[in-house]
Amino acid sequence: MNPKNIKMSAGILALNRIKKQQLKEIPDKLKPENIHDAYKIQEQMHNIFQEINFGKRIGYKIGCTSSVMRKYLDINEPCYGGILNTGTNYISANKNFQDFSMPGVEIEIAVFVNEDFKFSNETTIDEIPLDKLTLFPAIELVDNRWIDYKIIDKNSLIADDFFASEIILGNPLPSHKINNLDNLTGKLIINEDQVSEGNTKNIMKHPI
């Protein structure tokens, strides 16, 4: 895609998000042609958000890390989207349904990296300095900004931050104080009723 179309596509997605609307699809001539275009559009959208003080990207969420979600969305690999400072909450948050297009809730683990690292595609879990990481129990507030996301192509989903919206972080804990990080169970309870349960071993065998 040429830079002009990337900016136009990012502008459409940014405006749709700001207005809390649902989009049928990105116009054909502005759709990302591949995953590289998708992330370029996403990056441009983040630039727009920062320019208009809607929010600054401070991190990333990784979606479709479980085989269940990849099968559900018919996607072969994990995808990432931006986390904005204006969408980052600590310990608790009061939110109105009307502040989203079609919100959902997911239990997550958030990771704060205390210093910069360089990894290759061949990096193994044993090479990651866990003592340099701080972990948070987290709740992700996802938002479906599509009229029918099931017919939206993967690249368009990525360009739009892959359902990213907000995150609520719990109390931090150094990773070396957590035993069996690859076998932790998380439960989602709403009004005293458990509605979901997951295990970190399902996150590509290890959450880190």
Where are the model-predicted features located?
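Catalytic-core "active-site belt" of small-molecule-metabolizing enzymes
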Residues: N2-H206
